[in-house]
Each structure stands twice: as structure tokens, then as C-alpha cells.
């Protein structure tokens, strides 16, 4: 939350080659008693879905990682997004909507458990547009007992370097506290 000191808590979706996540409460990453808190990638979103590397089916990883998007679209991310934004193929729109639908499903469910803003971060974050955020919000809030406002979804600015920066900030914080 270095870039958002006003936030006390957040749910972080790290949209990298492999999906990752974090739960932040009271300005600290929640580790959990067995150190696996925030492993959003293995939340089941479809019990009959694709086989995940963990051995289960339908994990969010199989729908919302950058690898899953590339596999679905049949092309690298760096080719996919320019073609998508230029509206070159309705097929690409379908792949992106499917991606966003699964992401919104996970966000909607997590919002019921953890009442906190959502941070979209990682490799795919720079590709998100205002239109994508609006789409997510519509799908998160449809039929939801508790809705999210637009200012509760934040898009990270560090892209694929987010994990490295986050790891470094741990030591920066320790140094600052020691001074």
C-alpha cells in the first residue's frame, strides 16, 4: 500500500503469467496460520473447468492468469491487446469478456468475505482501461447484496515488476523504522 497510504486494507489481484494475490489488513499482508492466505489463484470458480497445475479443476488460475488468456486467445498478450483495442476481431472481445467475467465473479465473492478495496496489479494491469473497470463493476454489482464503487477498484502502476517492488519495500520499511 506504499502508493496508497490512505488504504488500511485491500484485496490484491496479481495478474501475472501465473495468477497471485494478497489480502492486506491493517497495512499488513495477512499471511494466515499456514502461510497461504491470499492464494486467490486456487479459488474454484468452476468445478467442471480446466485442469489446474495444482491438480484441481476450475481454479481462477485457469481463467485469469496471463498464461490462461494467451492460451484462450491463441496469441501473446502483447499482440492480443492492441488487436482487442482496435476492435479487429469479435473473437478477441469474447475472450476478454470471458476473462473479465471470471475475474468479476471472484471479486464479487471476495467482496462478501473481505470488505476492502480491490487492487488490480501485475503484468496485465497496464492493459486495463476505464471501460474494463466499468465492465467489472457492472458484473460485480449485479445482484450483489453489497456493491463496490468505482473508487474501490484501483489499478496498479508497476506492471510485471510489482512483486519485486513489493519485496524490496519490505526492506525499505525495515530500514526506515531503524533510522
PLM ranges: what are they?
Residues 1-60, 67, 172-179:
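Phosphate-binding/catalytic loop of phosphoryl-transfer enzymes
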Residues 2-4, 60-179:
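ATP-binding/phosphotransfer module of carbohydrate and carboxylate kinases, centering on a glycine-rich
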Amino acid at each position: 500500500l506504499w502508493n496508497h497510504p490512505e488504504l488500511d486494507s485491500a484485496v490484491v489481484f496479481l495478474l501475472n503469467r501465473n495468477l497471485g494475490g494478497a489480502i492486506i489488513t491493517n497495512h499488513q499482508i495477512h499471511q494466515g496460520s499456514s502461510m497461504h492466505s491470499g492464494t486467490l489463484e486456487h479459488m474454484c470458480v468452476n468445478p467442471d473447468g480446466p485442469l489446474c497445475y495444482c491438480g484441481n479443476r476450475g481454479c481462477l488460475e485457469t481463467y485469469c492468469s496471463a498464461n490462461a488468456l494467451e492460451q484462450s486467445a491463441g496469441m501473446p498478450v502483447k499482440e492480443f491487446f492492441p488487436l482487442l483495442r482496435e476492435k479487429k476481431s469479435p473473437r478477441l472481445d469474447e475472450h476478454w469478456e470471458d476473462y473479465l467475467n471470471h475475474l468479476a465473479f471472484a471479486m464479487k465473492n471476495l467482496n462478501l468475505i473481505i470488505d476492502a478495496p480491490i487492487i488490480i496489479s501485475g503484468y496485465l494491469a497496464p492493459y486495463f482501461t476505464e471501460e474494463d473497470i466499468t465492465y467489472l463493476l457492472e458484473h460485480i454489482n449485479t445482484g450483489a447484496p453489497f456493491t463496490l464503487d468505482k473508487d474501490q477498484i484501483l489499478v496498479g502502476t508497476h506492471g510485471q515488476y510489482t512483486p519485486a517492488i513489493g519485496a524490496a519495500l519490505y526492506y525499505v520499511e525495515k530500514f526506515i523504522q531503524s533510522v
